[in-house]
Amino acid sequence: MTLQRLFDHPDFMAIYKPIGVGMHSESGELGLQLLAEQQFGLKLWMVHRLDKVTSGVLLFAKHAEAAAQLSNLFSEQSIQKTYLALSQSKPKRKQGRIKGDMAAARNGSYKLLKTQSNPAITDFFSLSIELGLRLFVCRPKTGKTHQIRVALKSEGAAILGDQRYGQPSDRTYLHAWRIAFQYQKEAFQIEAAPLEGEWFNKNTFIDKLKQLENGNYWPEHWLKNQN
């Protein structure tokens, strides 16, 4: 497997995480960190994670000091993360904020609760791509396990291909599209379109993604009063 390097900086690098690769080695399969270290000939530090079924932009630090700084940015919610997801179900709402505590359920799954002691927070809006297919643009404000997958399921729109929470397909249609942050007073924005998946390669999706890339797509006005 050859990993794609998206961005290189003296202190960190961004790669494209393919689907089906875990962050850690398991069952004789090398994890993404070791694969990246072998390919690029560097010692790397993990500063955030993506689920095995998720593709997209992933950051690694190149030394311990950068790892501490970037990890702090993630923990302080100072890194803006934008994900793309597809669903064949009509959501309860087309846009909004999904907020609630998460609890472990059966067989490694999670569920969203009505309580808000330590809530997962996800902002989203959605657009119709074609009949029976909807694109969700999501910005998680927290970093809980399975957060976006559980959030969209709670809206009645489980992610296409998510066999844990929805219906099977050729992949789980969740992609880490873009990250934006400031590091040592310099602004960075790194993005990558999804490569894998029949539905992510349809012209209707590609055209919609181009519209998002070319405009100020995020509807800030309806989030001002969210809490």
What is each PLM-predicted segment?
Residues M1-S27, L35-F40, A64-E65, S71-N72:
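S4-like RNA-binding module at protein N-termini
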